[in-house]
Amino acid sequence: MSSVRLPSVDRLLRSAAAAPLHQRYGREALLATLRDLLDELREPARQGALAAIELSEAVLAGRAGERLAAQHASRVRRVFNLTGTVLHTNLGRALLPEEAIEAITLAARYPLNLEFDLASGKRGDRDDLITGLIRELTGAEAVTVVNNNAAAVLLALNSLGARKEGIISRGELIEIGGAFRIPDIMTRAGVRLHEVGTTNRTHARDYEAAIGPRSGLLMRVHTSNYSVQGFTASVPTAQLAAIAHGHGLPLLEDLGSGTLVDLTRWGLPKEPTVQEALADGADIVTFSGDKLLGGPQAGLILGNRELVGRIKKNPLKRALRVDKLTLAALEAVLGLYRDPDRLAERLTTLRLLSRPAVEIRAQAERLAPALAEALGEDWEVAVVDALGMIGSGAQPVARLASAALCLRPRQPRRLRGRTLRNLEEALRGLPLPVIGRLDDDALWLDLRQLDDEPAFRAQLPRLRGELS
Protein backbone atom coordinates (compact mmCIF):
# COMPACT_ATOMS: atom_id res chain seq x y z
CA MET A 1 0.00 0.00 0.00
CA SER A 2 1.43 3.40 -0.99
CA SER A 3 1.78 6.31 1.41
CA VAL A 4 -1.22 8.56 1.98
CA ARG A 5 -1.05 12.29 2.50
CA LEU A 6 -2.41 13.58 5.81
CA PRO A 7 -4.90 16.46 5.71
CA SER A 8 -3.75 19.66 7.36
CA VAL A 9 -4.94 20.66 10.80
CA ASP A 10 -6.39 23.85 9.34
CA ARG A 11 -8.40 21.91 6.78
CA LEU A 12 -9.81 19.63 9.45
CA LEU A 13 -10.66 22.58 11.69
CA ARG A 14 -12.65 24.18 8.86
CA SER A 15 -14.36 20.97 7.79
CA ALA A 16 -18.11 20.45 8.17
CA ALA A 17 -17.43 17.21 10.07
CA ALA A 18 -15.53 19.09 12.78
CA ALA A 19 -18.03 21.94 13.13
CA PRO A 20 -20.12 20.27 15.88
CA LEU A 21 -16.93 19.53 17.84
CA HIS A 22 -15.83 23.15 17.52
CA GLN A 23 -19.19 24.27 18.83
CA ARG A 24 -19.23 21.84 21.75
CA TYR A 25 -15.64 21.78 22.96
CA GLY A 26 -14.12 25.02 21.69
CA ARG A 27 -11.31 25.72 19.24
CA GLU A 28 -8.35 25.17 21.59
CA ALA A 29 -9.41 21.72 22.78
CA LEU A 30 -10.29 20.61 19.25
CA LEU A 31 -7.02 21.94 17.83
CA ALA A 32 -4.91 20.12 20.45
CA THR A 33 -6.77 16.85 19.88
CA LEU A 34 -6.44 17.02 16.10
CA ARG A 35 -2.72 17.75 16.35
CA ASP A 36 -2.18 14.77 18.67
CA LEU A 37 -4.21 12.53 16.39
CA LEU A 38 -2.35 13.56 13.25
CA ASP A 39 1.02 13.17 14.99
CA GLU A 40 0.11 9.58 15.82
CA LEU A 41 -0.98 8.83 12.25
CA ARG A 42 1.91 10.52 10.43
CA GLU A 43 4.33 7.58 10.46
CA PRO A 44 1.73 4.87 9.62
CA ALA A 45 0.51 7.09 6.75
CA ARG A 46 4.07 7.54 5.43
CA GLN A 47 4.63 3.78 5.50
CA GLY A 48 1.40 3.16 3.61
CA ALA A 49 -0.22 1.34 6.52
CA LEU A 50 -3.43 3.38 6.29
CA ALA A 51 -6.16 3.49 3.67
CA ALA A 52 -7.31 6.84 2.33
CA ILE A 53 -10.72 6.37 3.92
CA GLU A 54 -9.06 6.22 7.35
CA LEU A 55 -7.76 9.75 6.82
CA SER A 56 -10.99 11.26 5.55
CA GLU A 57 -12.36 14.31 7.29
CA ALA A 58 -15.36 12.39 8.58
CA VAL A 59 -13.30 9.55 10.06
CA LEU A 60 -10.72 11.83 11.65
CA ALA A 61 -13.41 14.10 13.09
CA GLY A 62 -15.14 11.04 14.49
CA ARG A 63 -11.97 9.83 16.20
CA ALA A 64 -11.30 13.31 17.55
CA GLY A 65 -14.85 13.44 18.85
CA GLU A 66 -14.40 10.17 20.72
CA ARG A 67 -11.26 11.48 22.38
CA LEU A 68 -12.82 14.79 23.30
CA ALA A 69 -15.89 13.08 24.74
CA ALA A 70 -13.69 10.88 26.92
CA GLN A 71 -11.56 13.84 28.03
CA HIS A 72 -14.58 15.97 28.93
CA ALA A 73 -16.67 13.25 30.56
CA SER A 74 -17.48 14.02 34.17
CA ARG A 75 -15.49 12.08 36.74
CA VAL A 76 -18.55 12.19 38.99
CA ARG A 77 -20.81 9.40 37.75
CA ARG A 78 -24.23 8.27 38.79
CA VAL A 79 -24.23 4.57 39.70
CA PHE A 80 -26.67 1.91 40.86
CA ASN A 81 -25.76 0.92 44.42
CA LEU A 82 -26.86 -2.73 44.55
CA THR A 83 -24.32 -3.77 47.19
CA GLY A 84 -26.90 -4.15 49.95
CA THR A 85 -25.19 -1.42 52.01
CA VAL A 86 -27.50 1.59 52.08
CA LEU A 87 -25.17 4.23 53.54
CA HIS A 88 -22.16 3.18 51.46
CA THR A 89 -19.24 5.50 52.19
CA ASN A 90 -17.58 4.85 48.82
CA LEU A 91 -20.83 5.50 46.95
CA GLY A 92 -21.77 8.78 48.60
CA ARG A 93 -23.71 7.77 51.75
CA ALA A 94 -27.11 9.42 52.23
CA LEU A 95 -29.28 10.31 49.23
CA LEU A 96 -30.85 13.71 49.69
CA PRO A 97 -34.62 14.23 49.61
CA GLU A 98 -36.17 16.48 46.98
CA GLU A 99 -36.60 19.30 49.50
CA ALA A 100 -32.84 19.40 50.07
CA ILE A 101 -32.06 19.25 46.35
CA GLU A 102 -34.39 22.19 45.72
CA ALA A 103 -32.78 24.13 48.58
CA ILE A 104 -29.29 23.52 47.16
CA THR A 105 -30.41 24.71 43.73
CA LEU A 106 -31.86 27.89 45.20
CA ALA A 107 -28.73 28.58 47.25
CA ALA A 108 -26.48 27.97 44.24
CA ARG A 109 -28.47 30.19 41.89
CA TYR A 110 -29.19 33.28 44.00
CA PRO A 111 -27.62 35.44 46.72
CA LEU A 112 -28.88 34.52 50.18
CA ASN A 113 -28.67 35.63 53.80
CA LEU A 114 -25.80 33.30 54.70
CA GLU A 115 -24.27 35.67 57.25
CA PHE A 116 -26.69 38.58 57.10
CA ASP A 117 -29.37 39.38 59.66
CA LEU A 118 -32.38 40.56 57.67
CA ALA A 119 -34.05 42.01 60.77
CA SER A 120 -31.17 44.25 61.88
CA GLY A 121 -29.40 44.70 58.56
CA LYS A 122 -26.12 43.71 60.22
CA ARG A 123 -23.74 40.81 59.87
CA GLY A 124 -25.20 37.54 61.06
CA ASP A 125 -24.00 34.06 62.04
CA ARG A 126 -24.40 31.24 59.51
CA ASP A 127 -25.18 28.79 62.30
CA ASP A 128 -28.32 30.82 63.02
CA LEU A 129 -29.88 29.35 59.87
CA ILE A 130 -30.40 26.03 61.67
CA THR A 131 -30.19 26.96 65.36
CA GLY A 132 -33.95 27.38 65.76
CA LEU A 133 -34.68 24.01 64.17
CA ILE A 134 -32.07 22.24 66.28
CA ARG A 135 -33.47 23.75 69.47
CA GLU A 136 -36.98 22.74 68.49
CA LEU A 137 -36.05 19.18 67.54
CA THR A 138 -33.49 18.33 70.24
CA GLY A 139 -33.80 20.82 73.07
CA ALA A 140 -30.13 21.78 72.69
CA GLU A 141 -29.23 25.30 73.77
CA ALA A 142 -26.85 25.96 70.88
CA VAL A 143 -25.36 24.38 67.76
CA THR A 144 -22.52 24.87 65.34
CA VAL A 145 -21.82 22.99 62.11
CA VAL A 146 -18.54 21.90 60.52
CA ASN A 147 -17.74 19.88 57.41
CA ASN A 148 -17.91 16.36 58.90
CA ASN A 149 -18.10 14.55 62.23
CA ALA A 150 -14.35 13.96 62.36
CA ALA A 151 -13.93 17.73 62.26
CA ALA A 152 -16.63 18.11 64.91
CA VAL A 153 -14.80 15.78 67.31
CA LEU A 154 -11.44 17.43 66.61
CA LEU A 155 -12.79 20.95 67.12
CA ALA A 156 -14.71 20.10 70.29
CA LEU A 157 -11.71 18.34 71.85
CA ASN A 158 -9.32 21.14 70.97
CA SER A 159 -11.68 23.83 72.26
CA LEU A 160 -12.53 22.16 75.57
CA GLY A 161 -9.55 19.98 76.44
CA ALA A 162 -6.34 21.35 74.91
CA ARG A 163 -3.30 20.86 77.17
CA LYS A 164 -5.45 18.82 79.55
CA GLU A 165 -6.36 15.18 79.95
CA GLY A 166 -9.30 13.61 78.18
CA ILE A 167 -10.62 10.58 80.06
CA ILE A 168 -12.13 7.83 77.93
CA SER A 169 -12.84 4.12 78.24
CA ARG A 170 -10.26 1.84 76.66
CA GLY A 171 -13.12 0.06 74.91
CA GLU A 172 -14.10 3.25 73.05
CA LEU A 173 -10.76 4.00 71.38
CA ILE A 174 -12.24 3.28 67.99
CA GLU A 175 -11.03 3.57 64.42
CA ILE A 176 -13.67 4.43 61.85
CA GLY A 177 -11.53 4.09 58.73
CA GLY A 178 -9.57 6.54 56.67
CA ALA A 179 -6.96 6.85 59.44
CA PHE A 180 -9.48 8.34 61.90
CA ARG A 181 -8.54 6.94 65.29
CA ILE A 182 -9.76 8.49 68.51
CA PRO A 183 -6.31 8.39 70.20
CA ASP A 184 -4.73 10.12 67.19
CA ILE A 185 -7.48 12.73 67.00
CA MET A 186 -7.10 13.50 70.70
CA THR A 187 -3.35 13.95 70.22
CA ARG A 188 -3.88 16.25 67.22
CA ALA A 189 -6.40 18.21 69.26
CA GLY A 190 -3.80 18.78 71.97
CA VAL A 191 -5.60 16.57 74.49
CA ARG A 192 -3.61 14.09 76.57
CA LEU A 193 -5.26 10.69 76.35
CA HIS A 194 -6.10 9.07 79.70
CA GLU A 195 -7.68 5.70 79.01
CA VAL A 196 -9.49 3.81 81.74
CA GLY A 197 -10.96 0.35 82.20
CA THR A 198 -10.40 -2.53 79.81
CA THR A 199 -11.49 -3.38 76.28
CA ASN A 200 -14.64 -5.15 77.43
CA ARG A 201 -15.38 -3.73 80.88
CA THR A 202 -15.20 -0.20 82.26
CA HIS A 203 -16.81 0.88 85.54
CA ALA A 204 -17.73 4.18 87.18
CA ARG A 205 -14.92 3.73 89.68
CA ASP A 206 -12.41 3.71 86.81
CA TYR A 207 -13.45 7.23 85.80
CA GLU A 208 -13.53 8.44 89.40
CA ALA A 209 -10.01 7.18 90.02
CA ALA A 210 -8.69 8.87 86.88
CA ILE A 211 -9.98 12.37 87.58
CA GLY A 212 -7.36 14.76 88.89
CA PRO A 213 -6.03 18.33 88.60
CA ARG A 214 -4.96 17.80 84.98
CA SER A 215 -8.36 16.51 83.83
CA GLY A 216 -10.10 18.57 81.16
CA LEU A 217 -13.09 16.49 80.10
CA LEU A 218 -14.71 13.09 80.02
CA MET A 219 -15.45 11.58 76.64
CA ARG A 220 -17.86 8.89 75.58
CA VAL A 221 -17.78 7.45 72.05
CA HIS A 222 -20.61 5.37 70.62
CA THR A 223 -18.96 2.24 69.22
CA SER A 224 -21.24 2.15 66.21
CA ASN A 225 -19.00 0.26 63.78
CA TYR A 226 -18.29 -2.82 65.88
CA SER A 227 -19.84 -4.73 68.76
CA VAL A 228 -18.29 -6.29 71.85
CA GLN A 229 -20.55 -8.99 73.26
CA GLY A 230 -20.40 -11.37 76.19
CA PHE A 231 -18.72 -10.38 79.46
CA THR A 232 -19.02 -6.61 79.10
CA ALA A 233 -19.76 -3.53 81.19
CA SER A 234 -19.94 0.18 80.42
CA VAL A 235 -21.05 3.33 82.18
CA PRO A 236 -24.33 4.86 80.91
CA THR A 237 -24.30 8.47 79.77
CA ALA A 238 -26.40 9.67 82.72
CA GLN A 239 -24.03 8.16 85.28
CA LEU A 240 -20.97 9.39 83.41
CA ALA A 241 -22.44 12.90 83.23
CA ALA A 242 -23.02 12.87 86.98
CA ILE A 243 -19.39 11.90 87.57
CA ALA A 244 -18.12 14.62 85.22
CA HIS A 245 -20.34 17.34 86.66
CA GLY A 246 -19.46 16.32 90.20
CA HIS A 247 -15.90 17.31 89.41
CA GLY A 248 -16.75 20.39 87.36
CA LEU A 249 -15.86 18.74 84.05
CA PRO A 250 -17.82 18.61 80.78
CA LEU A 251 -18.94 15.37 79.16
CA LEU A 252 -18.43 15.14 75.39
CA GLU A 253 -20.38 12.37 73.66
CA ASP A 254 -19.70 11.40 70.06
CA LEU A 255 -22.69 9.54 68.61
CA GLY A 256 -21.04 8.91 65.24
CA SER A 257 -23.95 8.23 62.89
CA GLY A 258 -26.46 10.05 65.07
CA THR A 259 -30.23 10.11 64.71
CA LEU A 260 -33.06 12.38 65.85
CA VAL A 261 -35.74 9.67 65.91
CA ASP A 262 -36.28 6.25 67.43
CA LEU A 263 -35.61 3.99 64.45
CA THR A 264 -37.48 1.05 65.99
CA ARG A 265 -40.67 2.83 64.92
CA TRP A 266 -39.85 1.72 61.37
CA GLY A 267 -38.66 -1.76 62.29
CA LEU A 268 -34.98 -0.80 62.37
CA PRO A 269 -32.44 -1.53 65.13
CA LYS A 270 -32.31 0.78 68.12
CA GLU A 271 -29.70 3.54 67.87
CA PRO A 272 -29.14 6.15 70.62
CA THR A 273 -30.73 9.48 69.73
CA VAL A 274 -29.30 12.95 70.13
CA GLN A 275 -32.19 13.88 72.42
CA GLU A 276 -31.45 10.95 74.73
CA ALA A 277 -27.78 11.91 75.01
CA LEU A 278 -28.66 15.50 75.90
CA ALA A 279 -31.38 14.45 78.35
CA ASP A 280 -28.90 12.12 80.06
CA GLY A 281 -26.58 15.03 80.72
CA ALA A 282 -24.04 15.13 77.89
CA ASP A 283 -22.79 18.71 77.63
CA ILE A 284 -21.66 18.43 74.01
CA VAL A 285 -22.96 15.92 71.45
CA THR A 286 -21.41 15.41 68.02
CA PHE A 287 -22.76 13.41 65.07
CA SER A 288 -22.77 13.16 61.27
CA GLY A 289 -25.17 14.81 58.87
CA ASP A 290 -24.89 12.33 55.99
CA LYS A 291 -25.55 9.05 57.76
CA LEU A 292 -28.72 8.20 59.67
CA LEU A 293 -29.82 11.85 59.65
CA GLY A 294 -30.14 11.54 55.86
CA GLY A 295 -28.63 14.91 55.00
CA PRO A 296 -25.47 16.38 53.46
CA GLN A 297 -21.97 15.72 54.72
CA ALA A 298 -21.60 17.74 57.90
CA GLY A 299 -20.60 17.45 61.53
CA LEU A 300 -23.05 18.83 64.07
CA ILE A 301 -21.88 20.04 67.49
CA LEU A 302 -24.67 20.88 69.90
CA GLY A 303 -25.39 21.23 73.57
CA ASN A 304 -24.47 23.69 76.33
CA ARG A 305 -24.57 27.32 75.14
CA GLU A 306 -21.38 28.41 76.90
CA LEU A 307 -19.38 25.42 75.66
CA VAL A 308 -20.66 25.73 72.09
CA GLY A 309 -19.72 29.41 72.28
CA ARG A 310 -16.14 28.47 73.17
CA ILE A 311 -16.03 26.03 70.28
CA LYS A 312 -17.30 28.68 67.84
CA LYS A 313 -14.51 31.06 68.91
CA ASN A 314 -11.79 28.55 68.10
CA PRO A 315 -9.76 29.78 65.08
CA LEU A 316 -10.06 26.29 63.61
CA LYS A 317 -13.81 26.79 63.28
CA ARG A 318 -13.39 29.00 60.22
CA ALA A 319 -11.15 26.41 58.57
CA LEU A 320 -13.77 23.71 59.16
CA ARG A 321 -17.01 25.60 58.54
CA VAL A 322 -19.58 24.52 55.96
CA ASP A 323 -20.72 26.44 52.90
CA LYS A 324 -24.12 27.79 51.88
CA LEU A 325 -25.08 24.67 49.91
CA THR A 326 -24.54 22.38 52.89
CA LEU A 327 -26.49 24.65 55.22
CA ALA A 328 -29.35 24.96 52.74
CA ALA A 329 -29.60 21.18 52.40
CA LEU A 330 -29.23 20.61 56.14
CA GLU A 331 -32.01 23.06 56.98
CA ALA A 332 -34.32 21.35 54.48
CA VAL A 333 -33.59 17.90 55.90
CA LEU A 334 -34.04 19.01 59.50
CA GLY A 335 -37.36 20.56 58.54
CA LEU A 336 -38.68 17.13 57.54
CA TYR A 337 -38.24 15.92 61.12
CA ARG A 338 -41.02 18.27 62.21
CA ASP A 339 -43.46 15.76 60.74
CA PRO A 340 -42.31 12.32 61.94
CA ASP A 341 -45.51 10.66 60.69
CA ARG A 342 -44.46 11.33 57.08
CA LEU A 343 -40.70 11.09 57.59
CA ALA A 344 -40.30 7.67 55.95
CA GLU A 345 -42.14 8.93 52.86
CA ARG A 346 -40.07 12.07 52.43
CA LEU A 347 -36.59 11.29 53.81
CA THR A 348 -34.90 9.17 51.16
CA THR A 349 -32.49 7.41 53.52
CA LEU A 350 -35.21 6.33 55.94
CA ARG A 351 -37.45 5.22 53.07
CA LEU A 352 -34.73 2.96 51.69
CA LEU A 353 -33.76 1.60 55.10
CA SER A 354 -37.36 0.72 55.94
CA ARG A 355 -38.34 -0.64 52.52
CA PRO A 356 -40.25 -3.95 53.00
CA ALA A 357 -38.48 -7.12 51.87
CA VAL A 358 -41.64 -8.33 50.13
CA GLU A 359 -41.62 -5.23 47.92
CA ILE A 360 -37.96 -5.75 47.05
CA ARG A 361 -38.57 -9.41 46.19
CA ALA A 362 -41.43 -8.47 43.87
CA GLN A 363 -39.09 -6.11 42.05
CA ALA A 364 -36.48 -8.87 41.75
CA GLU A 365 -39.08 -11.24 40.29
CA ARG A 366 -39.96 -8.63 37.66
CA LEU A 367 -36.35 -8.08 36.63
CA ALA A 368 -35.02 -11.65 36.72
CA PRO A 369 -36.30 -12.69 33.25
CA ALA A 370 -34.84 -9.61 31.56
CA LEU A 371 -31.48 -10.11 33.23
CA ALA A 372 -31.45 -13.83 32.35
CA GLU A 373 -32.14 -12.97 28.71
CA ALA A 374 -29.35 -10.39 28.68
CA LEU A 375 -26.78 -12.76 30.19
CA GLY A 376 -27.71 -15.80 28.13
CA GLU A 377 -27.69 -19.52 28.83
CA ASP A 378 -24.23 -19.50 30.41
CA TRP A 379 -25.63 -17.85 33.52
CA GLU A 380 -28.04 -18.89 36.25
CA VAL A 381 -30.18 -16.00 37.49
CA ALA A 382 -32.03 -16.63 40.75
CA VAL A 383 -34.12 -14.48 43.08
CA VAL A 384 -32.86 -15.08 46.61
CA ASP A 385 -33.36 -13.72 50.11
CA ALA A 386 -30.57 -11.36 51.14
CA LEU A 387 -29.35 -9.56 54.23
CA GLY A 388 -28.23 -5.98 53.76
CA MET A 389 -26.54 -3.48 56.05
CA ILE A 390 -27.19 0.10 57.13
CA GLY A 391 -23.56 1.03 56.48
CA SER A 392 -21.25 3.90 57.45
CA GLY A 393 -20.54 2.30 60.80
CA ALA A 394 -24.15 2.18 61.97
CA GLN A 395 -25.34 -1.05 63.64
CA PRO A 396 -22.62 -3.37 62.26
CA VAL A 397 -24.29 -6.52 63.60
CA ALA A 398 -27.83 -5.72 62.44
CA ARG A 399 -29.01 -6.96 59.06
CA LEU A 400 -31.80 -5.71 56.79
CA ALA A 401 -34.03 -8.39 55.27
CA SER A 402 -33.93 -7.89 51.50
CA ALA A 403 -33.93 -9.71 48.16
CA ALA A 404 -31.30 -10.00 45.47
CA LEU A 405 -30.66 -11.22 41.97
CA CYS A 406 -28.00 -13.90 42.36
CA LEU A 407 -25.92 -14.35 39.19
CA ARG A 408 -23.87 -17.54 38.98
CA PRO A 409 -21.94 -18.82 35.92
CA ARG A 410 -22.79 -22.33 34.76
CA GLN A 411 -19.24 -23.65 34.87
CA PRO A 412 -16.95 -25.54 37.26
CA ARG A 413 -16.29 -23.70 40.50
CA ARG A 414 -12.57 -23.36 39.77
CA LEU A 415 -13.33 -21.29 36.66
CA ARG A 416 -15.92 -18.95 38.11
CA GLY A 417 -13.60 -16.34 39.57
CA ARG A 418 -12.47 -14.81 36.28
CA THR A 419 -15.96 -15.05 34.79
CA LEU A 420 -17.47 -13.21 37.75
CA ARG A 421 -14.80 -10.52 37.58
CA ASN A 422 -15.58 -10.06 33.89
CA LEU A 423 -19.26 -9.63 34.73
CA GLU A 424 -18.41 -7.13 37.46
CA GLU A 425 -16.37 -5.15 34.94
CA ALA A 426 -19.15 -5.31 32.35
CA LEU A 427 -21.69 -4.02 34.86
CA ARG A 428 -19.37 -1.18 35.84
CA GLY A 429 -18.93 -0.37 32.15
CA LEU A 430 -22.63 0.26 31.52
CA PRO A 431 -23.79 3.85 30.89
CA LEU A 432 -25.14 3.80 34.46
CA PRO A 433 -22.58 1.59 36.24
CA VAL A 434 -24.02 -1.18 38.40
CA ILE A 435 -22.17 -2.01 41.62
CA GLY A 436 -22.98 -5.33 43.28
CA ARG A 437 -21.08 -7.65 45.60
CA LEU A 438 -19.34 -11.00 45.21
CA ASP A 439 -20.31 -13.75 47.62
CA ASP A 440 -20.45 -17.55 47.51
CA ASP A 441 -19.16 -17.85 43.93
CA ALA A 442 -21.86 -15.52 42.63
CA LEU A 443 -22.51 -11.85 41.98
CA TRP A 444 -25.35 -10.49 44.11
CA LEU A 445 -27.44 -7.48 43.13
CA ASP A 446 -29.37 -6.45 46.24
CA LEU A 447 -32.30 -4.35 45.02
CA ARG A 448 -33.09 -2.43 48.21
CA GLN A 449 -31.76 0.78 46.65
CA LEU A 450 -33.02 0.28 43.10
CA ASP A 451 -35.29 3.29 42.72
CA ASP A 452 -35.06 3.74 38.94
CA GLU A 453 -36.18 0.36 37.64
CA PRO A 454 -36.84 1.53 34.03
CA ALA A 455 -33.30 2.93 33.65
CA PHE A 456 -31.80 -0.27 35.05
CA ARG A 457 -33.89 -2.47 32.77
CA ALA A 458 -33.22 -0.34 29.66
CA GLN A 459 -29.47 -0.94 29.70
CA LEU A 460 -29.56 -4.70 30.36
CA PRO A 461 -29.41 -5.65 26.62
CA ARG A 462 -25.96 -4.01 26.47
CA LEU A 463 -24.58 -6.69 28.76
CA ARG A 464 -24.45 -9.35 26.06
CA GLY A 465 -22.19 -7.15 23.95
CA GLU A 466 -20.01 -6.24 26.93
CA LEU A 467 -19.48 -9.91 27.84
CA SER A 468 -18.88 -11.25 24.33
Curated annotation (Swiss-Prot):
Pathway: Aminoacyl-tRNA biosynthesis; selenocysteinyl-tRNA(Sec) biosynthesis; selenocysteinyl-tRNA(Sec) from L-seryl-tRNA(Sec) (bacterial route): step 1/1
Keywords for the protein's UniProt record, in alphabetical order: Cytoplasm, Protein biosynthesis, Pyridoxal phosphate, Selenium, Transferase
Matches recorded under InterPro entries: PyrdxlP-dep_Trfase, PyrdxlP-dep_Trfase_major, SelA-like, SelA_trans, SelA_trans_N_dom
Domain of life: Bacteria
GO cellular component: a single term: cytoplasm
GO biological process: conversion of seryl-tRNAsec to selenocys-tRNAsec; selenocysteine incorporation
Residues with N6-(pyridoxal phosphate)lysine modification: K291
EC annotation from Swiss-Prot or TrEMBL: 2.9.1.1
Keyword Zinc-finger: no
Gene3D superfamilies, alphabetized: 3.90.1150.180, Type I PLP-dependent aspartate aminotransferase-like (Major domain) (3.40.640.10)
Lipoprotein is among the record's keywords: no
Subcellular location, record wording: Cytoplasm
Record's catalysed reaction(s): L-seryl-tRNA(Sec) + selenophosphate + H(+) = L-selenocysteinyl-tRNA(Sec) + phosphate
Recorded GO MF terms: L-seryl-tRNA(Sec) selenium transferase activity
Cofactors (names): pyridoxal 5'-phosphate
Family: Belongs to the SelA family.
Function: Converts seryl-tRNA(Sec) to selenocysteinyl-tRNA(Sec) required for selenoprotein biosynthesis.
Name used for this protein in its record: L-seryl-tRNA(Sec) selenium transferase
Species, as recorded: Pseudomonas paraeruginosa (strain DSM 24068 / PA7)
Gene encoding the protein: selA
